[in-house]
A protein has these predicted regions:
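Short glycine/proline- and acidic residue-enriched helix-loop micro-motifs
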Residues: 9-11
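Short N-terminal amphipathic alpha-helices
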Residues: 36-41, 55, 68-71
Length: 402
């Protein structure tokens, strides 16, 4: 008799990490179902609804029957609108034929890697940095290699460490500005220096700029795209999720070198086929009619950032950097704790505050936690008070965090 053979998870899939954000959220939801109050500082999602014009555009598209397949690259109208917007916002002429629409930003990052990285080639990514970079590089059978950000200088790019990480097997560098989780931004001189390194070593740069509109203190975002020439290998990644509070719409895009457009379109044809047309209509409405809405949302984020920064600065047990963009704080815990993972669990179970441990963002995130201020000021203030209470309790060493 032939024994039943169980389906075994592949080696590649075994190497992928699960999202820490959703894991913490799941635990928090279980606690809430049991009647416990949880203050949510873990998920990186704007607590706003999309601009009304977006929903109206989607309704109209559905009423018109735009519910069938459309072009894999994305409808022409949206690509033209993105090109116009990006030309104006980033200060460089964009060809609509270089724009590709995907369901969120992750697929365009994944497809860029799939279309340009061969097995065994190395891809550099920031540490601390967005937790999916390492998994996506692993998924395409590349070799993920972290480079450090200098926390003592506002999480600026550590070029000494970056240079040591580059070798003959290096194929690409991922950058993220503003940064998740640190909120830091790469400066113009850093971007120019990075571009020179990429030119010298013939490296691809993947620039994740999904937080580029969420900037504070009247500063302007500087994109590496501002300095590229036709010969540079640079991919720009952006999304509607954060800018327009459209996380559930799953709408992102990439602006790519001409050589990568056809390979990525092939990957789309063989995977999700296309982004629904009615969702893309919402994207057009967001760009055309949502700019004042974005300004108001960013103003509210800045108000929260300033208030929470005041509260965090009063906590002796941490060191905190004031974020320039995005909606995260990434404080370092300066007392003796087993790990940020253990502390985050202790904080959730005993004080009802959900946040993310810094280890989820790389080795350099040890003893850090990520605090999302995408929540009401009332909840944020309450959560920070509990955060402080937990730190004081740990410092006294009278409470076990095991």
């Amino acid at each position: 008799m032939i024994k039943d053979k169980k389906v075994v998870e592949s080696q590649v899939c075994q190497k992928l990490t699960e999202s820490a954000s959703f894991a913490v959220l799941a635990t928090a939801k279980r606690m809430e179902r049991s009647g416990k109050e949880v203050l949510h500082l873990e998920i990186g999602e704007p607590d706003f609804s999309p601009p009304p014009a977006v929903k109206e555009a989607v309704y109209k598209s559905l009423e018109k029957g735009e519910t069938h397949y459309t072009t894999p690259q994305g409808i022409r109208e949206l690509r033209e609108e993105i090109a116009r917007y990006e030309t104006e916002f980033r200060g460089v002429e964009i060809d609509p034929d270089r724009v590709i629409i995907t369901p969120g930003a992750k697929p365009i990052i994944l497809f860029t890697l799939l279309s340009s990285i061969d097995p065994g080639e190395e891809v550099l990514y920031p540490d601390p940095g967005y937790l999916s970079y390492k998994s996506l590089i692993t998924f395409v059978v590349g070799v993920p290699v972290p480079y450090h950000l200098n926390k003592n200088e506002g999480f600026s790019l550590d070029f000494d460490h970056l240079s040591k990480q580059i070798n003959k097997n290096t194929a690409a560098i991922i950058i993220n500005s503003p940064s998740n989780p640190t909120g830091s931004m790469l400066k113009e001189e850093e971007l120019k220096r990075l571009l020179e390194i990429a030119r010298e070593r013939e490296l691809l740069i993947i620039s994740d700029e999904v937080y580029s509109r969420i900037i504070y203190d009247n500063k302007s975002h500087v994109s590496i795209f501002k300095f590229v020439t036709e010969d540079d290998k640079v991919v720009l990644i952006d999304s509607f999720s954060k800018t327009y509070a459209m996380t559930g719409f799953r709408l992102g895009y990439g602006i790519l070198p001409n050589e990568l457009v056809r390979p990525i379109v092939k990957l789309i044809q063989n995977s999700f086929s296309c982004v629904p047309q009615f969702i893309q209509r919402g994207g057009i409405a967001a760009i055309v009619n949502g700019q004042e809405y974005v300004k108001a949302m960013v103003q509210e984020f800045e108000r929260r950032r300033d208030r929470i920064y005041e509260l965090l600065k009063e906590i002796d047990e941490i060191q905190v950097h004031k974020p320039e963009g995005a909606f995260y704080f990434f404080p370092e815990i300066r007392i003796d704790i087993p790990s940020a993972v253990v502390f985050a669990q202790y904080l959730l179970e005993n004080f009802g505050v959900a946040l993310l441990p810094g280890e989820a963002f790389g080795e350099q995130g040890q003893k850090h936690v990520r605090i999302s201020f995408a929540n009401s000021l009332e909840i944020l203030e309450k959560a920070i008070r509990r955060f402080k209470e937990a730190l004081v309790a740990c410092k006294k060493s009278t409470i076990s965090m095991s």
